[in-house]
Design a protein with these regions (language model features):
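Basic, alpha-helical terminal appendages of large translation-related enzymes
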Residues: 1-6, 46, 122-127, 131, ...
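Structured secondary-structure scaffolds
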Residues: 2-49, 101-105, 156-372, 415-419
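Conserved, charged catalytic cores of large soluble enzymes
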Residues: 2-14, 19, 31-205, 240-252, ...
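Short helix-to-loop capping/linker segments positioned immediately adjacent to catalytic or ligand/cofactor-binding
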Residues: 182-185, 402-415, 464
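Short, charged/polar, low-complexity loop and linker segments
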Residues: 339-344, 397-405
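Non-transmembrane, amphipathic alpha-helical segments
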Residues: 347, 351, 388, 407, ...
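Generic structural concept
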Residues: 356, 360, 393, 397, ...
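Aromatic-residue-lined binding/catalytic grooves and analogous aromatic/hydrophobic interfacial grooves
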Residues: 375, 413, 506
């Protein structure tokens, strides 16, 4: 895998026709966990999120709500930013496609592609879905000319002169690129979807609209506005500009390009895995090494939708259960890349079992014993002398490699399972080793080793879980006597040597421990409202 010294990654720029839904929260939580993992490695990291704000759908939505398009965008953007704060998302840049600096980047990029001969005026005829902002093939339509994705909406017939991008010119180049970079599209199931789409033959696509006012004018023909995707994808580039820099492509691409990872939902895969690399090839720019399309979420086994009235409000969910709970459930319970389900009963069970019982109780029990047997200090012993086959050391020494590989592969569920295995082994070991009996026998050396190895295992689990549950990991670390905040990566790197903390055996003997307090309250299902 191509390893640059800096790591920029993106969520999609979310469409602002409506307030954020659970799917947007899911992608953003995953991106935030990946960004925190990279920062934990000491790698300069830039997490980009933002909003895609142009197009006919926004124009019509705003009109219905009796707002100006920009007022509408501003209100929805506030909703996204508030949710990201609530979910403890540490984004570095929030890219809005209505930003004036973005227009300058789009104009320069357009002119570069135009100079290459890749833009021409042509006639666009076809069935157009306003909700998708895209033309549909007749063979894909449902009965009564309805869109296969927005099945409650009829498509509209369009016949207009538009500007086109010569996607067909990049057919061979794209196929070669996919063959030489098999990891570009992940997971493999998504890669296969893209390859079969491309093999059917690429058609040039329209990049402008004639009767849409809400968008940037086409630089060479102000009568037309640029189509939402040509504008939106470039929002990733604009986001790379330093706040004070003049908005030129050279400035935007100077430090962070190529972006190392685009995280997206599989519904926008084609734009990121086909249109976007072709646009970049046309502009002679290096391509990002990885696009990862995750799966869809269902609720209680059913597709979520407003029409079905079973949507899951991410704000309400997070306010009720807390950010760590929501982050943990979605990253642990769903194999990243596959479709996954949310069920509230399961949600409560998983969090209580893993975080309140396995992790929380283990820390609490062990700290209480350390208070009783070791005056609330880390037991004193020779750490290096602990036998390599000690059940906790044996797992603990493998954690770093297993977990970092899993994070690099976006296998968040595997990260959680590996660390849970360490914690569950800790619980079993504590029961079997029975330090209370050893203490009564006066065997203080045995007590020291038992408590040290359990506390160290909890510490190591907290360290590696911190990208997923940063607040919980901070609480654990503070109870173990560190003044560490996993929410502040700058201060974190100044407080601890990260390269010591990522391995087993770092807890310092005789370090003062805090008073044991429960780190994760047991969750309860909301009681059904009395009729």
């Amino acid at each position: 895998m191509h390893h640059s010294s800096v790591f920029a990654l993106t969520t999609p720029l979310y469409y602002v026709n409506d307030l954020p839904h659970i799917g947007s929260a899911y992608t953003t939580i995953a991106a935030d966990a990946m960004a925190r993992f990279q920062r934990l490695q000491g790698r300069p990291t830039l997490l980009i999120t933002g909003t895609d704000e142009h197009g006919q759908k926004i124009e019509r939505t705003a009109e219905k709500l009796d707002r100006s398009p920009l007022d509408h965008c501003n209100q929805v953007v506030q909703g996204f930013q508030d949710l990201w704060t609530l979910l403890n998302i540490q984004y570095d840049r929030f890219s809005r496609t209505t930003d004036a600096r973005h227009e300058a980047i789009v104009r320069e990029f357009y002119q570069r592609v135009e100079a290459k001969g890749d833009i021409y005026l042509g006639q666009q005829q076809g069935w157009y879905c306003v909700a998708c902002e895209e033309f549909k093939e007749e063979r894909d339509l449902l009965s009564e000319k309805r869109c296969p994705i927005h099945s409650n909406q009829a498509v509209e017939w369009r016949d207009e002169r538009n500007y086109f991008f010569r996607l067909s010119r990049y057919q061979d180049q794209l196929e070669t690129f996919y063959a030489e970079h098999p990891d570009f599209i992940q997971p493999a199931s998504r890669r296969n979807e893209v390859l079969s789409f491309v093999r059917r033959g690429l058609q040039d696509f329209s990049i402008s609209r004639i009767n849409v006012r809400w968008g940037f004018p086409v630089p060479s023909d102000p009568e037309q506005t640029l189509y939402v995707w040509f504008d939106a994808l470039l929002g990733y580039v604009t986001a790379l500009l330093e706040p004070e820099a003049e908005p030129t492509l050279a400035n935007a691409l100077k430090h962070w390009w190529p972006i190392q990872l685009h995280l997206i939902g599989k519904d926008i895969l084609r734009f990121h895995a086909v249109y976007w690399p072709a646009m970049l090839m046309s502009a002679d720019l290096p391509l990002p090494p990885r696009v990862f399309g995750h799966g869809f979420l269902t609720k209680d086994g059913q597709k979520m939708g407003k029409s079905l009235g079973n949507t899951l409000d991410p704000v309400g969910l997070t306010q009720q259960y807390g950010a760590d709970a929501v982050r943990y459930y979605f990253l642990k319970e769903i194999e990243f890349g596959r479709d996954g389900d949310f069920n509230e009963t399961r949600f409560v069970q998983v969090l209580n079992a893993d975080l309140a019982n396995d992790l929380g109780n283990l820390l609490n029990r062990t700290l209480s014993m350390a208070k009783k047997y070791c005056q609330s200090r880390v037991p004193t012993l020779e750490v290096a002398a602990i036998a390599p086959e000690h059940p906790l050391k044996a797992i603990g020494t493998t954690v770093k490699d297993r977990v970092s590989t899993a994070y690099e592969n976006l296998a968040f569920s595997q990260v959680c399972h590996t660390l849970l295995e360490l914690v569950q082994t800790g619980n079993r070991y504590l029961d079997q080793a029975a330090p209370w009996t050893r203490y009564k026998e006066g065997n203080t050396e045995a007590v020291a080793e038992i408590l040290y190895t359990v506390l160290e295992s909890v510490r190591l689990a907290a360290y590696w879980l911190s990208p997923i549950v940063p607040a919980l990991s901070t609480q654990i670390y503070q109870q173990l006597g560190y003044s560490v905040d996993f929410g502040d990566s700058v201060k974190l790197q100044a407080t601890v040597v990260l390269s010591d903390h990522d391995r087993w055996g770092t807890l310092r003997p005789d370090q003062a421990l805090a008073n044991p307090t429960p780190i994760f309250r047991t969750l309860e299902l909301p009681s059904a409202d009395p009729e």
